């Protein structure tokens, strides 16, 4: 029978000092036999996805206390990728994931907490907390802040839906008037919550649901809706049950590694492919799997991508649907239900509610459930009122979207495409793979060949695009922006956005060892591995080299002979200590980022730290 970890600091005469300090936090004698549960919050006023979380930790804590636990809250950092985008701040985004994971480990292990409730929401916060949870392997429940309502405005006498990416595109489009650009900017992000499309934050919150670590509805229920409060209340109650099951009944099924098994990871990736999620999710799932000591690799993702169809299409791949529409169609479990009927899921998995996948679908899949309360929950909709308050409205759609032929979520028979929304490509400068969000690629450019225009920084590429130096048919190559080379693996949302602004969104390709925002669409290929700074062949590409992209056949090729590639690699090595570094780039890199770069692996490993360098 496992002992409560917290007993280390609450029992025994030699722990008198620790107990004295616990008493100073408000604990009493009656608390010293109870489980201590960490409420891991991520409130910040910097990030709209987290601005409403201040009081939600207290909400969870009250339920923990009422259920017989002791709640202790702490906060992590949270970087807003949208605000950090397009300048040096983006160098810090991905490294913040490791800091978040480490800070959770530090706090939980230093104070011997028994379990956790993780209150996350945005891009690197959910992955960081997920990595920590699987590293620590103590009972955990995730409950996120929820998606933002889609923006809406009237243009040309028509009400249209908007999101952050629309504001960026129109802001850079010289054909758009200042008045219209300002109107879109003011309308794009109307409420608190994670940005309203299937960007990285919402993708990851959907995946925690598929992994079984969060409750039904977590990925899609709006931040502003009153129904979301129940997820927080239930999380506080349920975590105490899970904790007691493990420590008092020796039931290891309550542990995250037994819930988020390899089968669950495969289900999560299957969901991601089917819903056309952010390419960043690949990076984060690979990293989380390593923390869980699960053998889940790019090869597994490649196999899944070849058999899973696209059953859901959401912004940025279309402006017709946002997360509020996904929720109306049944949310994550609506998509999982269709995948299950198609025979594409592992059914022998459980979630934090203790339900198997078939049991969960029977209760929560809107296409089969008989539970009116569940149907009501999935009719929760937007209010269209600007606010930063959680649970501030109770609007509902009159009906569910259960049209699986032409609705937001489709059945296998009516799939958006037989190929899923993500694909892994391999070739002679991506030997370990690269990722493309096929959901956002126009059918006309699934096969594309063109001359390379090579840039050694995102800034240089942006200047070239806006300066008219990139033309129709070009393949823009941005290198030395990987985890090690950046360092920090910047998101390339600005280059892809500006290609659209210049009318080149369907006329050019962009390839990088960096990564893309969940808001990216178009022929944007990232995570090229090995990266340039690790000796990858992306470093030897020159202007004018022809590059062939073949998404249907999962190929990407630099059209050079093996002999020429070998000669260029030899020339690169001849640069000595300057080999595999950018030639002309000037970039100030802080000590903190240099420390990150010294251990960073390429994207095919999830950009995690190389344990072998630490003797681990």
UniProtKB/Swiss-Prot annotation:
An annotated GO BP: L-valine biosynthetic process
Cofactor: [2Fe-2S] cluster; Mg(2+)
Active site residues of this protein: 517 (proton acceptor)
GO molecular function, one term: magnesium ion binding
Residues that bind Mg(2+): 81, 123-124, 491
Pathway(s): Amino-acid biosynthesis; L-isoleucine biosynthesis; L-isoleucine from 2-oxobutanoate: step 3/4; Amino-acid biosynthesis; L-valine biosynthesis; L-valine from pyruvate: step 3/4
N6-carboxylysine: residues carrying this PTM: 124
Catalytic activity: (2R)-2,3-dihydroxy-3-methylbutanoate = 3-methyl-2-oxobutanoate + H2O; (2R,3R)-2,3-dihydroxy-3-methylpentanoate = (S)-3-methyl-2-oxopentanoate + H2O
General function of this protein: Functions in the biosynthesis of branched-chain amino acids. Catalyzes the dehydration of (2R,3R)-2,3-dihydroxy-3-methylpentanoate (2,3-dihydroxy-3-methylvalerate) into 2-oxo-3-methylpentanoate (2-oxo-3-methylvalerate) and of (2R)-2,3-dihydroxy-3-methylbutanoate (2,3-dihydroxyisovalerate) into 2-oxo-3-methylbutanoate (2-oxoisovalerate), the penultimate precursor to L-isoleucine and L-valine, respectively.
Recorded family membership: Belongs to the IlvD/Edd family.
Protein name per UniProt: Dihydroxy-acid dehydratase
Underlying gene: ilvD
């Amino acid at each position: 029978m496992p002992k409560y970890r917290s007993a280390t600091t609450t029992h025994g005469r030699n722990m008198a000092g620790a107990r004295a300090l616990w008493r100073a936090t408000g604990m009493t004698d009656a608390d010293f036999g109870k489980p201590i549960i960490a409420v891991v919050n991520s409130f910040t006023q910097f990030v709209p996805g987290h601005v409403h979380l201040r009081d939600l930790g207290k909400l969870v804590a009250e339920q923990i206390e009422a259920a017989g636990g002791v709640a202790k809250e702490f906060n992590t950092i949270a970087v807003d990728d949208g605000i950090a985008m397009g300048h040096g701040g983006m160098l810090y985004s991905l490294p913040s994931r490791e800091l978040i994971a480490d800070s959770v480990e530090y706090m939980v292990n230093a104070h011997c907490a028994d379990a956790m409730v993780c209150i996350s929401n945005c891009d690197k916060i959910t992955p960081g907390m997920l990595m920590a949870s699987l590293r620590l392997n103590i009972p955990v429940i995730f409950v996120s802040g929820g998606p933002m309502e889609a923006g809406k405005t009237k243009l040309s006498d028509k009400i249209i839906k908007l999101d952050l990416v629309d504001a960026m595109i129109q802001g850079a489009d010289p054909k758009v008037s200042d008045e219209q650009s300002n109107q879109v900017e003011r309308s794009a992000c109307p409420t608190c919550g994670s940005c309203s499309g299937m960007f990285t934050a919402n993708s990851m919150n959907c995946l925690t649901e598929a992994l079984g670590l969060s409750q039904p509805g977590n990925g899609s229920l709006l931040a502003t809706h009153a129904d979301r409060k129940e997820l927080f209340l239930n999380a506080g109650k349920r975590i105490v049950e899970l904790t007691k099951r493990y420590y008092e009944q020796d039931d290891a099924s309550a542990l995250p590694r037994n819930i988020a098994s390899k089968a669950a990871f495969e289900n999560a990736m299957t969901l991601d492919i089917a819903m056309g999620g952010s390419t960043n999710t690949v990076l984060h799932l690979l990293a989380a799997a390593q923390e869980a000591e699960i053998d889940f690799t790019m090869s597994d993702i490649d196999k899944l991508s070849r058999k899973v169809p696209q059953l859901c299409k959401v912004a940025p791949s279309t402006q017709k649907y946002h997360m509020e529409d996904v929720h109306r169609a049944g949310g994550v479990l609506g998509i999982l239900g269709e995948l299950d009927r198609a025979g594409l899921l592992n059914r022998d998995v459980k979630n934090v509610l203790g339900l198997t996948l078939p049991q969960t679908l029977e209760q929560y899949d809107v296409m089969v459930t008989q539970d009116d309360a569940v149907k009501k929950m999935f009719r929760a909709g937007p209010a269209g009122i600007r606010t930063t308050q959680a649970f501030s409205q109770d609007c509902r759609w009159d009906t569910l979207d259960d049209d699986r032929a032409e609705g937001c979520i489709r059945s296998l028979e009516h799939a958006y495409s037989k190929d899923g929304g993500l694909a892994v490509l391999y070739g002679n400068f991506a030997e370990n793979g690269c990722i493309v969000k096929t959901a956002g690629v126009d059918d006309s450019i699934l096969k594309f060949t063109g001359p390379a225009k090579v840039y050694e920084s995102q800034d240089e590429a942006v200047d070239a695009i806006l300066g008219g130096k990139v033309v129709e048919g070009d393949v823009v190559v941005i290198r030395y922006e990987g985890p090690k080379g950046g360092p920090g693996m910047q998101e390339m949302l600005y280059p892809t956005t500006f290609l659209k602004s210049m009318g080149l969104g369907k006329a050019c390709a962009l390839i990088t060892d960096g990564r893309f925002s969940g808001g990216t669409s178009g022929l944007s290929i990232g995570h090229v591995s090995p990266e340039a700074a690790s000796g990858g062949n992306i470093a030897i590409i020159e202007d004018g080299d022809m590059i062939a992209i073949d998404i249907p056949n999962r190929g990407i090729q630099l059209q050079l002979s093996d002999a020429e590639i070998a000669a260029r690699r030899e020339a690169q090595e001849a640069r000595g200590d300057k080999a595999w570094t950018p030639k002309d780039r000037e970039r100030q890199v802080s000590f903190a980022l240099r420390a990150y770069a010294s251990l960073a692996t390429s994207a095919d490993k999830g950009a995690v730290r190389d344990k072998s360098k630490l003797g681990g």
